[in-house]
């Protein structure tokens, strides 16, 4: 295009308007401006706007997909947390039930052992009492016989 400094220096001031005289140049510049705008719109702006619009649609579609995946991930997370919580509660109940069963088994075994020990002690003590009684009876007979022997020896 024409350099502005050359245009200003080559213009001569003749008449009342000088450089800013309204003659055929202003409509010519306006027509050039409109032609330039139409050309730029056809050549540059339309393809650029279509590319921008395609990019916008691409970003929006991927954003929607990402939002859907995020929602699915949140749903799965809550579902897995609920499953984990129920599994944890079931495990705690299983542990508590197992502990109660083992405690009952231990109590039963302890009772059986205690009864066995009591019966064994009863048997041993009755055996000892019987042996003591027989020993005392035999000692009594021995003492009686010894006493009679001593009496017979003393009376001689």
Swiss-Prot record:
It is a single-pass membrane protein. The chain crosses the membrane at residues 24-44. Belongs to the ATPase B chain family. GO terms for molecular function: proton-transporting ATP synthase activity, rotational mechanism. The keyword Coiled coil does not apply. Its main location: plastid. In plastids the F-type ATPase is also known as CF(1)CF(0). It comes from the Eukaryota. GO terms for cellular component: chloroplast thylakoid membrane; proton-transporting ATP synthase complex. It is found in: Plastid, Chloroplast thylakoid membrane. Keywords: ATP synthesis, CF(0), Chloroplast, Hydrogen ion transport, Ion transport, Membrane, Plastid, Thylakoid, Transmembrane, Transmembrane helix, Transport. The lineage of its organism: Eukaryota, Sar, Stramenopiles, Ochrophyta, Bacillariophyta. F(1)F(0) ATP synthase produces ATP from ADP in the presence of a proton or sodium gradient. F-type ATPases consist of two structural domains, F(1) containing the extramembraneous catalytic core and F(0) containing the membrane proton channel, linked together by a central stalk and a peripheral stalk. During catalysis, ATP synthesis in the catalytic domain of F(1) is coupled via a rotary mechanism of the central stalk subunits to proton translocation. F-type ATPases have 2 components, F(1) - the catalytic core - and F(0) - the membrane proton channel. F(1) has five subunits: alpha(3), beta(3), gamma(1), delta(1), epsilon(1). F(0) has four main subunits: a(1), b(1), b'(1) and c(10-14). The alpha and beta chains form an alternating ring which encloses part of the gamma chain. F(1) is attached to F(0) by a central stalk formed by the gamma and epsilon chains, while a peripheral stalk is formed by the delta, b and b' chains. It holds the Pfam family ATP-synt_B. HAMAP family: ATP_synth_b_bprime (MF_01398), ATP_synth_bprime (MF_01399). This is ATP synthase subunit b', chloroplastic.
């Amino acid at each position: 295009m024409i350099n502005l400094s050359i245009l200003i220096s080559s213009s001569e001031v003749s008449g009342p308007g000088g450089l800013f005289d309204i003659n055929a140049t202003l409509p010519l510049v306006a027509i050039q401006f409109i032609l330039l705008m139409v050309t730029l719109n056809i050549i540059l702006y339309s393809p650029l706007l279509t590319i921008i619009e395609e990019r916008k649609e691409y970003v929006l579609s991927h954003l929607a997909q990402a939002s859907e995946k995020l929602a699915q991930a949140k749903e799965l997370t809550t579902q897995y947390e609920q499953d984990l919580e129920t599994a944890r509660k079931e495990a705690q109940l299983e542990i508590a039930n197992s502990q109660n069963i083992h405690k009952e088994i231990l109590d039963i075994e302890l009772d059986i052992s205690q009864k066995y020990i009591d019966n064994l002690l009863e048997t041993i003590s009755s055996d000892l009492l019987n042996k003591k009684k027989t020993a005392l009876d035999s000692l009594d007979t021995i003492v009686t016989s010894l006493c009679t022997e001593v009496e017979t020896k003393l009376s001689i």
